[in-house]
Amino acid sequence: ECGAPDNSMAALEYAMSLGCYGMECDIYWTKDNDIIVAHANGDCKVNNLQPWTATVAELRAAGRLSNGEELPTLEEFIRRVMVEGNCTRLVLDVKRVDKPYAQPEYVINAARRACEIVTEMKAKHFVELICTGFNLDAMKAAHNCAVIAEVPIGMNSSRSGKEYGTLGFGWANLSAASGMDAAAGGKGSCSLEEYEKAGVALSVYNVDQRAGDGNAVYSTAAVNYYIANYKRFRTLCSNYPKWLIGKIDHAYKVYDGIRSEADFEAFAESLASDPTGRRFLDGNGEVVLHCDLTLNGFVPLSNFSGTFNGNGKTLTIGYRGDAQQIGLFKRLSGTARNLTV
């Protein structure tokens, strides 16, 4: 969204400027027992090197990020978020190591060393962990490290809610596209209700504005599902955080009646999911029109079941079309009064 490379300091600064809950950071253990924050390729390589075979200096010498930044370490990222007034956490994604073959010991090393650094820097309130679920030993080891460091930990796996509870994990992190079910716009079999029933908090990645990420959903129906249910999720991850925050703010904003054409448009949009228009109600339970408005390109509103108090004002509507569609509401099962149209 901001054009910064993944896992860059610029991306972190952007997330912090928006007041995001957190930024996901991919982490790997290095040969010199440090942790780099980097997005590896399909061969688990960063700058054409597998991180666990190289030192931080060697990885940095092999190349920079596309914006010219030096490859960052976890310590540098922690130092940046531990500042007065910042609310953005680092959500450390302990990446699987499966190239050229599965090597869970390096996943365990990454979880262990990351938690040690967090403890050394007294940063437990600024960091959370997500561990890959591909290897049971790595998963259990990461969980133990996180518990000792007092850092929240989730698992990235489409296991059932019941399995999460059995393994001691209270937080699941799933792909929106392949993990979540059709009701959420995905192709998987996991549902929000299943995890709620099991007492497991649920995060998903990603809810996006457009196609481009294989784990993302971006259809209007899917986006609307997550917006309608976002308070039931632990976190929603997105490659377009400013866009998603704006969508959520718009959907949950509480209005003082209708005072502008923009307010009226928001009211009309809200009726699709809430025919009472509750976000626009005053203390008497009415939607009050506070000024005369001229509406162009008007489409009759969805079913309205509340009370629309025109407050003696006038709606002037520019309309051309089927005479059967003329009217303020397609269906009115409530009351409209004190209004001139």
Label for each model-derived stretch:
Residues E1-K253:
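Phosphate-group recognition and catalysis centered on beta-loop-alpha active-site segments
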